[in-house]
Amino acid sequence: MIESFKRIYDNRHEYIGKWKEKHPDRKIMGYMCTSMPEEIIYAANALPIRILGGHESQNVSQQHMMGTFCPFSRDVLAQGLLGKYDYLDALGITHTCQHIYQAYESWVLHKNIKSFYIPTPNTSQTPHALPYLRGQLKLFLEKLEDWTGRKIGENDLRRGIEIVDTTRKLMKQIYEMRKSESPPISGLDSMLMVVAAQMSDKEEFNTILEDVIKNELPGRKAKATPSSRLMLIGSEHDDVKFIEMVENLDAIIVIDDHCTGSRYFWNTTEQNEDALTDIANRYIKKPPCPIKDFPVRKRTAHIVNLANEWNVAGVIEIQQKFCDPHELDRVAVSKALEKAGFPILNLEADVTMPVGPFRIRVEAFLEILSSEELF
């Protein structure tokens, strides 16, 4: 049921605690970036779960991270230092931004936890990226074999691909339904769906998705009256209060591009080569975040295409305060959207602070969209 998305998100630690009771022999790896190859972790019979912040003020990360690092990275580290994720057997990360990598290093240092780092390519726009990444995934696989005491074969990898790709296909099917004039699911429930998928056992979660698609979404309307169709883009964003505030106004978010949204699941695995090569190829081709989108900026065309396909009236770009990659990306993305005829509202957020101050700006933006629709 759709309510399951929020229940898993709100009770993520209790969910994993119960899962661990049912699967005492399986290990759990937390990860901090959506470039982490979950397929290989499932192939090792372990459970990958995404680590996110708690959206609460805290005072435990200041001595470990600079104040000019993004609030999200400091919030994530605080979760580890406060013991919220003490059930993890390991922590994993790929090449990512400096801020979240510092959270990872400090967590590993102070919690003395088994760690895995995959130095994924800085950019996918080179012919060397695929063979390089395949080699790094092979090394990661071998380390997982040592960690779990389990040999990982081709069939295991294919099973991991099947589990994760099924989740991706089902969530994309739901996103496609949001193209309709009266979307059957809100932007908030869509975001909760994606983060719940990141925080749960996908074999269990896939049955929930199938049930929602078959029994809940047909004929359903997320909003009773027509509303301004918005796109949400920017850095990591799982702020329930913000999305709730936007959709309580005369608006509905119908599409997004961020790592707790479509970017996480947008492409599936093309099965053309051996499994490791196929997995590497999938991550090379996934919609990039700003830190990997060079020398040619490809994100802008992808974002504009989404805005067109989902027929949005305007775009809200919300970035974490001090998020350098998105700060550098913001101007190019904004210009591309404006050139394509999409008004954009740029906001800078602190995930640990109230969202009330944004309400006036969002209301003003919606008034502009309404006046443009009249003419």
Regions found by a protein language model. Name each.
Residues 80, 294-311, 328-329:
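A short, acidic, amphipathic alpha-helical segment used as a generic capping/interface helix at domain edges
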Residues 55-72, 264-279, 361:
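N-terminal beta-loop-helix "entrance" segment that forms/cooperates
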Residues 33-84, 89, 103, 108:
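An N-terminal, globular interaction/scaffold subdomain
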Residues 75-146:
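Acidic/His-rich segments in extracytoplasmic proteins that coordinate ligands and/or metal ions
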Residues 52-58, 120-123, 257-262, 349-350:
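Short, acidic/turn-prone active-site loops that include or flank metal/cofactor-
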Residues 331-375:
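Peripheral docking tails and interdomain loops at the edges
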Residues 1-27, 138, 142-267, 292:
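A charged, amphipathic alpha-helical module
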Residues 34-35, 39-52, 234-304:
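Redox- and metal-dependent alpha/beta enzyme cores, enriched for Fe-S-associated oxidoreductases
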